[in-house]
């Protein structure tokens, strides 16, 4: 039997997509490399993906990036939109064994998540995004791989620092499993 998405997850996808757009539009640091910024939306995507799972993470990445592109540029850059969905899915799977909802975010969780997110960012932004740019848009390889390398490094650092801090902060607001006792 198929599991249906909860109302909570659907609402999280909508709100998460909106926040992704806002962060992607207004909380970025320009790099000097064309159409490539230091993004704060991916650390947020990491948090949402870990909390709500890979399907929600993928949809937040897809919807959020699509809306961001249309509101910023007037058109969508589908190769990178697809990659935002893929990285959201990867973040969600990377967080499967973590229990942020019950206040658990151990050093082991941090290390394991950051190894997975670094590997995911390398594959997605360093290989898939540039390859799709070449296949879909016939972009010059040197340009798109330069963008890909910078996006890879900046996303690894941003998710590693800001994403980890967001997850730690979120976990610290949750009640730890077994911490409450009946009087």
Swiss-Prot record:
Keywords: Cell membrane, Membrane, Transmembrane, Transmembrane helix. This is UPF0397 protein EF_2154. Belongs to the UPF0397 family. The keyword S-adenosyl-L-methionine does not apply. It comes from the Bacteria. The keyword Membrane applies. It holds the Pfam family ECF-ribofla_trS. Its main location: membrane. The chain crosses the membrane at residues 10-30, 44-64, 74-94, 115-135, 147-167. GO terms for cellular component: plasma membrane. The lineage of its organism: Bacteria, Bacillati, Bacillota, Bacilli, Lactobacillales. It is a multi-pass membrane protein. It is found in: Cell membrane.
């Amino acid at each position: 039997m198929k599991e249906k998405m909860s109302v909570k997850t659907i609402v999280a996808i909508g709100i998460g997509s909106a926040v992704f757009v806002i962060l992607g539009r207004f909380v970025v640091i320009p790099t000097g490399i064309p159409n490539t910024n230091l993004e704060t939306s991916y650390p947020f995507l990491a948090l949402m993906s870990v909390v709500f799972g890979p399907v929600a993470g993928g949809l937040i990445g897809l919807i959020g990036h699509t809306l961001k592109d249309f509101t910023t540029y007037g058109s969508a850059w589908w190769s990178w939109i697809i990659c935002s969905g893929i990285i959201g899915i990867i973040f969600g799977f990377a967080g499967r064994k973590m229990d942020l909802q019950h206040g658990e975010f151990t050093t082991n969780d941090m290390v394991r998540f950051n190894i997975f997110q670094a590997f995911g960012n390398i594959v997605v932004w360093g290989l898939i995004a540039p390859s799709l740019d070449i296949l879909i848009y016939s972009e010059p390889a040197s340009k798109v791989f330069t963008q890909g390398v910078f996006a890879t490094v900046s996303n690894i650092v941003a998710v590693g620092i800001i994403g980890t801090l967001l997850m730690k902060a979120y976990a610290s607001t949750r009640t730890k499993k077994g911490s409450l006792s009946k009087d």
